[in-house]
Amino acid sequence: MVKRNQRKKSAPKKRLTKAEVEKQRAIKRMILSVLMALLLIFAMLRLGVFGVTTYNMIRFLVGSLAYPFMFAWLIYLFCFKWLRQKDGMIAGVVIAFLGLLVEWHAFLFAMPRMLDQDIFLGTARLITRDLLALRVTEFVGGGMLGALLYKPIAFLFSNIGSYFIGFLFILLGLFLMTPWDIYDVSHFVKEAVDKLAVAYQENKEKRFIKREEHRLQTEKEALEKQAQEEEKRLAELTVDPETGEIVEDSQSQVSYDLAEDMTKEPEILAYDSHLKDDEASLFDQEDLAYAHEKIGAYDSLSALASSEDEMDMDEPVEVDFTPKTHLLYKLPTIDLFAPDKPKNQSKEKNLVRKNIKVLEDTFQSFGIDVKVERAEIGPSVTKYEIKPAVGVRVNRISNLADDLALALAAKDVRIEAPIPGKSLIGIEVPNSEIATVSFRELWEQSDANPENLLEVPLGKAVNGNARSFNLARMPHLLVAGSTGSGKSVAVNGIISSILMKARPDQVKFMMIDPKMVELSVYNDIPHLLIPVVTNPRKASKALQKVVDEMENRYELFSKIGVRNIAGYNTKVEEFNASSEQKQIPLPLIVVIVDELADLMMVASKEVEDAIIRLGQKARAAGIHMILATQRPSVDVISGLIKANVPSRMAFAVSSGTDSRTILDENGAEKLLGRGDMLFKPIDENHPVRLQGSFISDDDVERIVNFIKDQAEADYDDAFDPGEVSDNDPGFSGNGGAAEGDPLFEEAKALVLETQKASASMIQRRLSVGFNRATRLMDELEEAGVIGPAEGTKPRKVLQTN
């Protein structure tokens, strides 16, 4: 017995490993799959009694979809692993197949012979008949499974509705078989809707432009027709040889009146909508009489000058030309600009009610008792005016800007503590959507005096009121902000506002555009002294020409005995009223520099000297400057420039340092961009937040074309800077390093290639010492390649390779 037990213990049963177990399972699964496949093949081929019976049993389950069902089953048996790897493939096939079952059964019970039969009994009777007779002859729809699905669907949605439900099942199954998810589909639908909306808006704008072009063409044709009739009338006039008076016969007068009546078309009212129907002519009789009177006066002046020498004879010709050109000049109207789009800020009102409660709760959590007095919804921000309790220090509220931004889930929060003229503190919170302020809307709502030629609407305040500024009182303006913040749009708005109010003989422009693309659209308008200057080296000479004009005007004022341009022009008007010899008033001059930093890189000393001299003395001479730059650093906006350009306009900047350079205080770094600005005029101690107006390129082109159609450019050679060369000794710009370190060009190339700048990198890559590397960094900063040091932050590379 002992030996027998020992023999049993010495031969224990061997346990299979996990791999062996898995292998056995795979073998069993393969055998089962092969047997199942043979069974399905017999059924598909209907071989003998066994095949027909098996096929009818499958038909009993899925009806006439037996073949697709068996084919899908075969694929599942041999491609199981592949199907498991495809997310949603099996579920999609099952759901789509269920939809087909519903469709097939709905088709079955739409047949006349099945209309009055019970769904389950009728389906079972058809299948059982074939099963017992060992045949396959009847169409049985979706089998018993189809009957099970079809009965509740048909009860709820009828037979026709069953088709629609089955189709939805099929679509859902196909969608699950695709690699897309519901987010992809919704995103695709959203993009398609957005594209349709954009296409609709573009078509709408194109239709508007087409209508405007047709209107302008009609008005132009009417004006040409009127001019032809005027020429015809003048040709038919006869002059009395004895008295020299014009004798008009009644026939010519009648024909002229008829021609004038024919030109009174309704479209002309678009230029002067305030005129009555009987005043709808583009140039009324008073204007024509005044023009004839002036032309006669200047003709007599030319005859008087013909008795003098040849050089003097040229002057009356110029004087004669200018008044006759501008007497019939018509100012552009606001109809040239695209109409304003309606705005809906009802969403903001609901958000404001919620934010008032959040603000009070947040202050309460910090132990500060405040009350929100009012909230003003502006185009870009909402201003909450809060009243702190007695004894609450203002700086406690000012220090909570970041906490308030967190509580309100806002991009940034600007605190105005206190609001000038009020015992309240303002908290400016960005709106969920910035409402665009169009130039046309701002112009129609502004109360700018049309007599003040340089008073232009600038933007809308937080309370929605239009704010205007008079450049003559500024007297110069500095516009600064990062790229894309809205500087160029603001400059275009200022130029367009002046063009809307001033004739070419009243205001002249000198435009300097080193970028070559911002102001070039204004070329060839009659308001320009010279074509738009795009060469930075020419720009410094052009500014010097303006300085010379300023000095000449002061000498003229001294001789006449007046203090400013207004006094001089008054003297001219008095002289013209009492004398036959006419003098032309001096026009105002507006100098616009679109990128000051580029000029300072090429000729910093000359440009800075000219700007400082103009800033100190040009106001009384009627010369004003608008300086724009996207690089508000101290090497561009020097202390002397800031002292002589007291009015500032700051758009969004990247840091508080840039904001302090522009405004002498923080705040611009919290702006939102897209025209959001802080405006600090000369007569205010604190900046005002405004949303600048948007003027499109199409609007600018329309007003420019309107002006060009009336008068041609008449450039003044006295302001022409002439030709300049790169070797001109008069320039002392910082654009190169001829007298600097020999490795300057290598260091510059390294910085431009890597777009990084540090003394340690120059040490390592150029194998130089620390002192030499720091000197190279200083030279790169002076050359405008890199920005100034900002503490521990890396220096910004201002140029690209």
From Swiss-Prot:
CDD domains: TrwB_TraG_TraD_VirD4 (cd01127)
Record-annotated disulphide pairs: none
Annotated transmembrane regions: 31-53, 58-80, 89-111, 131-150, 155-177
SMART domains found in the cross-reference section: AAA, Ftsk_gamma
Residue spans, topological domain Cytoplasmic: 178-801
Gene3D superfamilies the record matches: 3.30.980.40, P-loop containing nucleotide triphosphate hydrolases, Winged helix-like DNA-binding domain superfamily/Winged helix DNA-binding domain
Domain writeup: Consists of an N-terminal domain, which is sufficient for the localization to the septal ring and is required for cell division, followed by a linker domain, and a C-terminal domain, which forms the translocation motor involved in chromosome segregation. The C-terminal domain can be further subdivided into alpha, beta and gamma subdomains. The alpha and beta subdomains form the DNA pump, and the gamma subdomain is a regulatory subdomain.
Function: Essential cell division protein that coordinates cell division and chromosome segregation. The N-terminus is involved in assembly of the cell-division machinery. The C-terminus functions as a DNA motor that moves dsDNA in an ATP-dependent manner towards the difSL recombination site, which is located within the replication terminus region. Required for activation of the XerS recombinase, allowing activation of chromosome unlinking by recombination.
Name of the molecule in the record: DNA translocase FtsK
Organism of provenance: Streptococcus pyogenes serotype M18 (strain MGAS8232)
Lineage: Bacteria, Bacillati, Bacillota, Bacilli, Lactobacillales
